[in-house]
Amino acid sequence: MTTSTELVASVEIAHEARTERIPPGAADGEVLRVIPGDVVRVAALLGRDPQLARALAFGALSGGASLVALVGTHDGRTFVERGAFLREAQPDLVVALATDRRDADGLVELAEALRFGCAQQRPLPHILVSADESIRARIAASCPANTIEALPDVRTPAGREALVARLRAVRRRAQGNVVLRDEALEAAARAMAVEAKADVVLLDVTGGATSVIHARPDGAVVGVHERLGVGAAADRVVARAGLDRVRRWIPRAVEAPALLERVFNRARWPDAIPASVLALSLEMALAREAIAHVLADAERAGMSLEPAWAAPLVVLTGRLAQLPRAAQSLIVAMDVFGATGPTLVSRAPGDALVAAGALAARGRVATLPTIDPIAIVAEMWPRRSAIVRIKDSNGVIEERVSRGSFVLIRTKGVVEIVMPGTTVRPRAEELELGVVIDARGRPLSLPPRDAERIPTLTRWNSALDVLPAEVR
C-alpha cells in the first residue's frame, strides 16, 4: 500500500489478542491507533411517538452501542418497576426523547425513576435530551447529579449524526489519538465508492463485532455495527440466533454440547486460527449468523436494505476476508447477503484497507490498497430456464440456468457477463474464482433434517470447492 501519512508514521490496528502495525516495524514518529472501542450501554426514555424507538435503535446501531433498555411513558410499568429495570440495565448513557409537549410529565417521571434506580451507579450515566427546552430543564432539575446534554431530533439525519458522534466519543474513553474500527471502515467504504463511482457495500466480521456499511459515490455512508463476532463475541451470536441456527450451516452432524463447547473455546483463545475443518466450518457459520442478525436489526430499526442489496460492488474485510480459501469468504457473503443484481465480490485480507480508512477518517491523504476480486455473482430466480453469456479471454460461454442452480464457471482475463432481464453488464479484470450463478432463491432456506440438510450443504460447497474433500 502506498500511503501519504503526513505527520503519522504508522497505523497500529488492535485485534482481540494482538496488534498489527502498517507499515510494519518500529515507528519513527506519531502512531495512529485503531481500536474496537469500549462497550457503551444505552437506555432510552421515550415519549408516545412510536417512531422514536426505531430512530434510536438505528442511531445506536450506527454508533456501535448496545441498546439495553427502552422505557416508555405509557408502558404500564410502575415507578418502582421502571427504576429496577433501569438499575439492572446499568446504562452508560441515557437518551430521553419526546416530540410532544404532552409527554413532559411522563418523561420527567421516567427521569425520576432513573435517578431512583441508578443512584448507586458510578459513574452516573450522562443524559442526552432530545426534547423541548422546558422539558430538558425539568429533567435537569429531577436529576441534578447527572450531566445533561442537548441532542437534536434523532429522527432526522442531523440528529442521528449527533447521536453517533456522541456515542463514539464515549466509546473512545479519552484514549488519545485513536480511530474506532467502524469509523475507519466507513471512511474506507466512502473512498472506494468515490473512486469506483458506484455504490459499495463493505462487510466486516471480526472476533468481537460485525459491520455492514453502504457507501454511495456522492459520499453518503450508512453503517451499522454490532457486538456479534466469531471470537470473543461468538457466544453473543449463539445467544441471539440459537445453537440450532448456527449448527445448520455445518455440513456434518454435530452434537449440541460439543458444538457449544467449541463456541465458548473461541472466547478463550482470541484470534486463534481454526485448526480443523470443523473449527473452520464453525467460524463460517458464526460469520453467517452475525451478518444476518446485523441486517435484520438494521431493517427493524428502519434502515432500507434495498439500495445496499442493489450495490454492484461488495468488499469483504476482517476475519471474513482472511479465511483460507477465497471460496469460503465468498459463500459466507452469498448465503446471507441477498444481492438483487450482478455483483462483483472482492476481499481485502490483512489490515491495509483499515489503515487507509483510519488515515482518511482523520483527514489524511491515503491511497487505497489493491483488493482481490473473487468473483462476479449473478443472483437469479428465473421463471423458466434462461441463458447467461460469459465472455472472457477464452471466448464466450453460454450457461443455461434453472431454479435451484448453483454453479461456478472458471474464467481467465477480462470477464463480462450478459444476463436476461437487465441491461447491466458487469465487467471485471482477472477474477480469482470466476463467475458464480446463484439461482437458489431468497430468502435462502435449509431443510431442517440432517439427512436432507447435509447433502444440500455438501452440494453447495462442492460447487465452489469450499471445504477439503473429507467433509463432502
Predicted regions and their residues:
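Well-ordered mid-protein domain cores that form the structural environment of catalytic cofactors
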Residues: L45-L97, R101-D103
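Short beta-strand-loop/turn "lid" adjacent to the catalytic site in phosphate-handling enzymes
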Residues: D28-A53, A321-R325
